[in-house]
């Protein structure tokens, strides 16, 4: 019997029958194939209004997935993602063999099991309009790489995952979301830059509580001699509790980029654009289903929630000097100053007429910054490359600030 599915896997329910007439020439699927194949679909539409009343509407992601089980221990999963309606890519695609609950194997394009945003990427899995910044800028969701992995359950409620993956591409690192542009997304296989990732979690001890944590470590040279010695590490811990109307969660993530000055030298990134050596994010959030107050027996939910987040993707910079030295427009040596941290408060309502549909409204307020002031603008000559542009949703998230958000999310 296969082990229980982990949150990073997409296992949508069986498709609803009769939404559209069948094509006349099409043949129905054999009964055995239909029973073993599930087709899923999830996505989200968002509207944001900032403090200056500027409005931004977007479709951050639409995902279609197929989950097929040829037999009781073999599984094939593929998910196709349209990102901001501008990029079509595989979100995950793997072959899984699970001969026993204690051990299973996967190979293909795997989701890295770090952060709640990667463990449960569906927009119906979180209450806020968009993911917390920690899950966008520190442990960037949805983070996927080519590789092989093992998973299983050992003992009551103790689950594990381990992966050997293709490494990150250091030329895609940035100041605002350090690792986001370095993800391979299955587009390349950097064998020389192999990385490892893993996760342990305790499930339902007590019922409704999931506590876990994990880590990632790997090279990010992408075969470039200029990046020799560039290493990346991420550590993360999280907790979730959902029972009796309560929806509570917390997460902490910290990233390390060893010798990040190598990227800054190669790309000519200076001052506020320089890639950091450390960054972190932490948030806590709590919600309660108001429909539970009256003791109503209904599948609907009306969750009021509030949360706090503190984040700094550039909490520490490399102490090595640039080569050649970077200078300010005034002719001074360029400091490698970290950025101040951001503190955000979010609150709102998440209404679910059914578990697969969510209508969300929230407000995000930036309540202050702490730490060093932003570094002055820098200039440098002869930069050999340019950093990879951030996605629209990640770039908007990195700016932070006060805003109101509305969303319709679904997962079938």
Placement of each model-derived feature along the sequence:
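Charge-patterned, long linear interaction tracts outside catalytic cores
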Residues: 166-178, 188
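Outer membrane beta-barrel
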Residues: 27-170, 192-210, 283-294, 299, ...
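Active-site rim elements
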Residues: 136, 183-187, 272
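Outer-membrane beta-barrel pore domains
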Residues: 49-51, 96-98, 118, 208-412
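N-terminal periplasmic/intermembrane-space "pro-region" immediately following the signal or transit peptide
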Residues: 1-48, 160, 322-325, 330-332, ...
């Amino acid at each position: 019997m296969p082990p229980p599915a982990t949150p990073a896997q997409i296992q949508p329910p069986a498709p609803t029958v009769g939404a559209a007439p069948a094509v006349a020439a099409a043949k129905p699927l054999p009964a055995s194939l239909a029973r073993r194949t599930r087709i899923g679909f999830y996505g989200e539409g968002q509207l944001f209004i900032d403090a200056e009343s500027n409005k931004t509407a977007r479709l951050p992601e639409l995902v279609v997935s197929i989950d097929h089980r040829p037999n009781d221990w073999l599984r094939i999963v593929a998910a196709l993602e349209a990102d901001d309606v501008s990029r079509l890519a595989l979100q995950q695609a793997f072959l899984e063999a699970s001969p026993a609950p204690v051990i299973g194997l996967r190979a293909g394009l795997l989701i890295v099991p770090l952060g709640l945003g990667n463990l449960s990427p569906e927009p119906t899995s979180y209450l806020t309009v968009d993911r917390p910044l920690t899950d966008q800028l520190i442990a960037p969701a949805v983070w996927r790489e080519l590789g092989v992995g093992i998973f299983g359950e050992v003992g009551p409620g103790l689950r594990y995952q381990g992966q050997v993956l293709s490494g990150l591409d250091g030329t895609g690192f940035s100041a605002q979301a350090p690792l986001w542009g370095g993800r391979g997304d299955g587009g390349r296989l950097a064998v020389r830059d192999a990385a490892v990732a893993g996760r342990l979690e305790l499930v339902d001890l007590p019922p409704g509580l999931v506590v876990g944590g994990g880590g990632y470590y790997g090279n990010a040279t992408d075969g470039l001699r200029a990046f020799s010695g560039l290493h990346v590490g991420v550590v993360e811990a999280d907790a979730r509790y959902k029972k009796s109307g309560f929806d509570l969660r917390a997460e902490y993530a910290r990233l390390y980029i060893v010798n990040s000055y190598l990227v800054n030298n190669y790309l000519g990134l200076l001052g506020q654009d320089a890639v950091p050596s450390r960054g972190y994010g932490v948030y806590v959030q709590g919600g309660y289903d108001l429909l539970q107050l009256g003791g109503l027996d209904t599948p609907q939910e009306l969750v009021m929630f509030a949360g706090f987040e503190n984040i700094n993707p550039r909490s520490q910079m490399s102490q090595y000097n640039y080569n050649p030295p970077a200078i300010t427009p005034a002719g001074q040596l360029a400091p490698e100053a970290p950025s101040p941290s951001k503190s955000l408060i979010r609150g709102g309502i998440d209404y679910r007429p059914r578990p697969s549909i969510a209508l969300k409204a929230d407000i995000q307020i930036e309540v202050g910054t702490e730490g060093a002031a932003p570094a002055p603008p820098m200039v440098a000559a002869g930069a050999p490359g340019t950093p990879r542009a951030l996605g629209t949703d990640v770039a908007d998230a990195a700016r932070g600030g006060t805003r109101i958000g509305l969303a319709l999310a679904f997962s079938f």
